[in-house]
Curated annotation (Swiss-Prot):
It comes from Pseudomonas fluorescens (strain ATCC BAA-477 / NRRL B-23932 / Pf-5). The chain crosses the membrane at residues 15-31, 50-64, 72-89, 145-163. Residues 1-14, 65-71, 164-169 are cytoplasmic. SUPFAM superfamilies: DsbB-like. PANTHER family: DISULFIDE BOND FORMATION PROTEIN B (PTHR36570:SF3). Disulfide bonds join 41-44, 102-130. GO terms for molecular function: electron transfer activity; protein-disulfide reductase activity. One of its GO terms (biological process) is protein folding. This is Disulfide bond formation protein B 1. One of its GO terms (cellular component) is plasma membrane. Belongs to the DsbB family.
Amino acid sequence: MSDDRLGLGRERRFLVLLGIICLALIGGALYMQVVLGEAPCPLCILQRYALLLIALFAFIGAAMSSRRGVTVMETLVVICALAGAGVAGHHVYTQFYPSVSCGIDVLQPIVDSLPLAKIFPLGFQVDGFCSTPYPPILGLSLAQWALVAFVLTVILVPLGVVRNRKKTY
């Protein structure tokens, strides 16, 4: 097996792992919503969309056979992770300064009109306020954990590309 195919294989395995992790994070959010009664706010739902898109692009990228196709999907993964980091960062800011709410009356109709809110309302329909504090997990709020996950994705995907595609002479 050539070095080129080996590097692409590593990237594919990493993309599959990333997709599984994103789906697990969405599953964890649904568990907290349904079992623990933590109502999702508009920013929570937008973060779920970002995680879902990252998983989708990661799985598509893992199925691609060409280097160019994998690169395009990895680029889309990073773009979605940047968007998710922006939303999570705003969510963290809103939780630190509760007087600056996300405005459920402004974002709720927009988020609730997105297609998945109609198809799968349990997972993608707004129910709460962004400034509502929930118990932290290992010292961090859910928004902070989401921010960590998105930032790690933005850093690790390009690092994996550079590492796996480095030419040896």
